Amino acid sequence: KSPPAATAAGAIALPSVTLGKPDSRKLKLGWIGCGGRGSGAINQALTADSNVQLWSIGEAFKDKADAGLERIQKIHPGKVSVDKSRVFAGLDAYQKVIDSGVDVVILTTPPGFRPMHIKAAVDAGKHVFAEKPMATDAPGVRSVIKSIAKAKAQGTSIVDGFVWRWTYAQRDTYKRILGGDIGTTDPDGYFG
């Protein structure tokens, strides 16, 4: 909806790329899923731009939500604006974060929930960073495809955590492999 929100959503995954002209309004981030990967993602999001603040968090378990908040407050004390009324726990915590006035949601819950969370965020008009994978089965993939189409139509962003394909070094390496610079490759010899 606003260029800064698109910038933050993109900066979460691609911090070196500016997707819009920033303004002075601080973007409110909602963090859903406070485990290890979630801690890394929210740390990266708060590091990516000076105009972002963590506004609310959601986690299935209250103790994990509290621990996540405590952990990130130590790393980014000036960028965490989460009061106790915006720390949500339970299986509906994702919806409470989405409804808390955030601009961008960071989805780092277990991937089986991701299609439902993406849909809810897009339906609410939020920008989304969703950790990979976005879905774990065919119905989930179809749901995410529909959410992506809706996000495009309404002008909101969905960015996923699979960012290596966008770095110049990775792209150059891939191009060289396809070009035969290292000889013939065996695709069965790689897992990752």
Q: Residue spans of the language-model regions?
A:
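A contiguous active-site-proximal alpha/beta segment in oxidoreductase catalytic domains
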Residues: 127, 134-192
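N-terminal glycine-/serine-/threonine-rich beta1-alpha1-beta2 phosphate-ribose binding loop
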Residues: 2-126, 142-155
